[in-house]
């Protein structure tokens, strides 16, 4: 939203209540002048979509403007996205230079991401590299897997590792080597390890809050300006994951 005054367009950000302000502040995992890493909850969207719900980039702009008493525009560039029902670490750039460099790192595989997934069945092998060929159905907003190359399909690679088990579920660590649509959800479902709460890929029931039990746990990348290696760990929200800490 913007207002016009004396020929100048100035951004106007909403004012947060104290409870929301404190919640946002408490979920910032790292911040400096160049970037901000945020712990996203399930249900939040990273970037604006057709729902017209407020996205995190807009929320964080409002937060920074309010916290820093910033009269001008706040830059909050989206480096990568997480699906709406997924939680965990999301990186935002606070300058256009940082955004360009972080986008390049993401696209060239220099950004390493590890996820935690709570699944309904234990995998046959405790650790394995999975390679599938994925085809996206836009109308269904769903991804289908194949073990062999198909026309229009994209290769997807991830490595999972079994970490521990609870009475009913199993916790996997997933290292992502490619960033395809619904990749982890589709590939784990393909080996019979559907993610808890993920009805779209075969879970028997939803989670009470509409989430799926998939969390962006760890990100590692080179700082876009200082060039030092950054490692960020995002605490989980999922009760099953919390019980495994």
Model-assigned labels for residue ranges:
Residues 1-245:
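RNA pseudouridine synthases
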């Amino acid at each position: 939203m913007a207002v016009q005054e004396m020929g100048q367009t100035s951004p106007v950000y909403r004012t947060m209540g104290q409870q929301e302000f404190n919640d946002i502040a408490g979920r910032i995992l790292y911040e400096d002048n160049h970037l901000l890493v945020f712990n996203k909850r399930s249900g939040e969207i990273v970037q604006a979509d057709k729902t017209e719900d407020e996205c995190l980039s807009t929320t964080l702009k409002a937060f920074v403007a309010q916290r820093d008493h910033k009269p001008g525009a706040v830059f909050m560039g989206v480096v990568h996205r997480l699906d709406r029902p997924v939680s965990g670490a999301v990186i935002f750039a606070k300058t256009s230079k940082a955004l360009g460099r972080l986008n390049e790192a993401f696209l060239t595989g220099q950004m390493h991401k590890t996820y935690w997934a709570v699944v309904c069945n234990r995998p046959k092998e405790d650790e394995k590299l999975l390679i599938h060929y994925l085809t996206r159905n836009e109308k269904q907003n769903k991804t289908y897997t194949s073990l062999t190359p198909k026309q229009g399909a994209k290769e997807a690679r991830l490595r999972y590792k079994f970490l521990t088990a609870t009475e009913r579920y199993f916790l996997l660590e997933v290292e992502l080597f490619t960033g395809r649509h619904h990749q982890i959800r589709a590939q784990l479902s393909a080996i019979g390890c559907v993610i808890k709460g993920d009805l779209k890929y075969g879970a028997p029931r939803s989670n009470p809050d509409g989430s799926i039990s998939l969390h962006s746990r760890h990100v590692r990348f080179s700082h876009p300006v200082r060039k030092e290696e950054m490692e960020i760990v995002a605490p989980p929200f999922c009760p099953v994951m919390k019980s495994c800490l």
